[in-house]
Amino acid sequence: MIFLLHHLVEHYADQTPDADAVFCLQDSLNYASLNKKSNQLAHCLNKNAVKKGDRVGIYMDKSLEMAIAVYAIFKAGAAYVPLDPSAPASRIAEIIQDCRIDVLISADNKIKRLTKVNEQLSKPLTLMGCSQSIENCSSISWAKIHAEFSTCNLRVKIIESDLAYIIYTSGSTGKPKGIMHTHSSGLVYAKWAANEVKLTAIDRIGNHSPLHFDISTFDWFATAFVGASTIVIPDEYTKMPASYAKLIEISQMTVLFTVPYALIQLSIRGELADRDLRQLRRIMYGGEPFPIKHLITLIEQLPQVTFDNIYGPAEINGCTRFTITDVQQSTTNIPIGKISQIAEALVVDENNNQVAYGESGELLVRTPTMMQGYWGRPELNQNVFYFQQDGVNELRQKFYRTGDIVKLDQDQTLWFLGRKDRQIKVRGYRVELDEIESTLVSFPDIEEAAVFSIKLEDHSNQVHGAYTIKGDIDCNTKQLNQYLKERLPSYAIPSVLKVRESFPRTTSDKINRTALSKEAEHDNN
């Protein structure tokens, strides 16, 4: 019986052992090999004191080894915590310490960066997957793992409600927040997603998103739910649209779930007309609205493809789908679709009263794919959940406050209108403007700072920062830029950064960010 995420691999290792599970360029693993190799790593984890409920970090590029690491951690009874290989060392160290990670699965090409991370940690790590070592840290190579540990399935007592993975996102206070998902929430999502887009064992699903991005859970778990194949798209390919398109062709990819920004780059620079992409049958996008003009162009370039708009924050996974059948130049907005049959939605005003059809309000969602909560953030958990009394069974139903403003049609179709707070998407990544602002104002020479965003012609978000200097100090902009690079992901660093003599103010003497946005939009035109 399948009730845990790693049961998917164990099931197909037994039923279709020779079926391909993962491809990465010329290399591949079938389900039998993936299961055996993940068992070996799981036994190694257990021998090195990893027990049920522990958190194990994954710090590597997309690869076959990453797939092995994910399922090995599940089998050991632990939860995986994916770490962004491109993030500053300080951010990685902060997550490791926040999550109390003792074991990190990585690769030799990350040793140099890990050395910087290790300098900021209070205690040494155990590194797995590395033949090289760093100061005070023990290392266990893949060669040793595959030579010395059993390929048999483990029998660790795990239940559906046990923690499976934690994905960290931006936090409004400047501190990243960890979204906790269980085996149950991950598996229910995998089943829902696979059924929604009609995945079968012959599908070949592209893995564009890095492991620390929530869309990746579709690429791995919905794929494994039906015994299909995951096609890993290396990071260097995602940055070169023409090579990306060629990989889609060569790998015979059938399904792809990614963000609009990546699809726009494929459309504009991917030379799609030169590729035979007849096997590509379905593209799903999520994370942010898709600019209509680019969507129309892509649909014209790929007429055989079914396009779906998938909605769902990382906290609840996917919960709506809208299949795009008719889009015109005059179209101004694409619906996010109807709430899934396994979920329930409320659209409420500021007093938590449901609004009428067609009126805007915040979207609240109750679903079995919802997170447990944020790791170690009880005060935040109190604010993001809403409990509605069930008059029939006298039970309190738990809803997640998405912070998204939507409207609901009479036919139960939801339309996304914007964000309630100051959270935006940049190239598909979720960015908290307040986190950037907190980081900017923490620079020693800065007195005040304001961070805001403007919409560009292609409807993407561009982050702007403005600041004032303390006294007569001459702020070193090179030092400031380096300061931000060491503390923020690349996509969160403001594209435009300006020093000001003063800020416009509201009547309550707060910085008037609306005025700043209008100034920036005027300067941009």
Language-model-detected regions and their locations in the chain:
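AMP-dependent adenylate-forming
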Residues: M1-L4, L104-S122, T126-V156, G186, ...
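AMP-binding/adenylate-forming domain of the ANL superfamily
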Residues: M1-M128, E135-I166, H181, V188, ...
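ATP-dependent adenylate-forming carboxylate-activation enzymes
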Residues: I2, M60-L64, A78-Q97, D108-R113, ...
